[in-house]
Amino acid sequence: MTVVIGVLALQGAFIEHVRHVEKCIVENRDFYEKKLSVMTVKDKNQLAQCDALIIPGGESTAMSLIAERTGFYDDLYAFVHNPSKVTWGTCAGMIYISQQLSNEEKLVKTLNLLKVKVKRNAFGRQAQSSTRICDFSNFIPHCNDFPATFIRAPVIEEVLDPEHVQVLYKLDGKDNGGQELIVAAKQKNNILATSFHPELAENDIRFHDWFIREFVLKNYSK
């Protein structure tokens, strides 16, 4: 039985995610306990084949509008709310899966999944984007130097359900409003959110490999 990881391909940086997952499969196939495959997802028929879904960075407003206008929103909503499925939202994807937005909330109809409040464009305009070396070794073994790229990135301003949502990583400092810069979190063991772009870490698949091992394979084996 093959475990299928889908990458939502309505808009955004989906090809980079596909390539990183493909690289994980090629380099680590002997260490994964299940056979894996990856595919792009543009409609409900493709989504129905998936065990996990990565929602990429891009433009959350465009993503939301495309899903609604094509009649895909309800299928996405049902998928991500299914506890047997795994969901990972990166940057715009994190915005799209969150329950609340603190700004520009009328522009995005979210999937109302991750129990947090998110601030869009917390790092300013694209010219202010940057790559920061982050120590993720508290949750990814030996990953103390990951190049995390933030592009007009959101942050989690508030965790609405601390019982089920675990903060994985905060950047040093605070935003202009005095809020902590929470940039990675998980909900239970099947929902992951990152405000940065692990798929833009060239030739570095550590984050995707961890996602596959800790979310996809563990959830599938239940």
Curated annotation (Swiss-Prot):
GO terms for molecular function: glutaminase activity; pyridoxal 5'-phosphate synthase (glutamine hydrolysing) activity. Disulfide bonds: none annotated. Coiled coil: none annotated. It catalyses: aldehydo-D-ribose 5-phosphate + D-glyceraldehyde 3-phosphate + L-glutamine = pyridoxal 5'-phosphate + L-glutamate + phosphate + 3 H2O + H(+); L-glutamine + H2O = L-glutamate + NH4(+). It holds the Pfam family SNO. CDD domains: GATase1_PB (cd01749). It comes from the Eukaryota. L-glutamine binds at residues 58-60, 120, 151-152. Pathway: Cofactor biosynthesis; pyridoxal 5'-phosphate biosynthesis. Keywords: Glutamine amidotransferase, Hydrolase, Lyase, Pyridoxal phosphate. InterPro entries: Class_I_gatase-like, PdxT/SNO, PdxT/SNO_CS. Its EC number is 4.3.3.6, 3.5.1.2. PROSITE patterns: PDXT_SNO_1 (PS01236), PDXT_SNO_2 (PS51130). GO terms for cellular component: cytosol; glutaminase complex. One of its GO terms (biological process) is pyridoxal phosphate biosynthetic process. The active site is at 91 (nucleophile), 197 (charge relay system), 199 (charge relay system). Belongs to the glutaminase PdxT/SNO family. Catalyzes the hydrolysis of glutamine to glutamate and ammonia as part of the biosynthesis of pyridoxal 5'-phosphate. The resulting ammonia molecule is channeled to the active site of a SNZ isoform. NCBIfam families: PLP_synth_Pdx2 (TIGR03800). This is Probable pyridoxal 5'-phosphate synthase subunit SNO2. It comes from Saccharomyces cerevisiae (strain ATCC 204508 / S288c). The gene is SNO2.
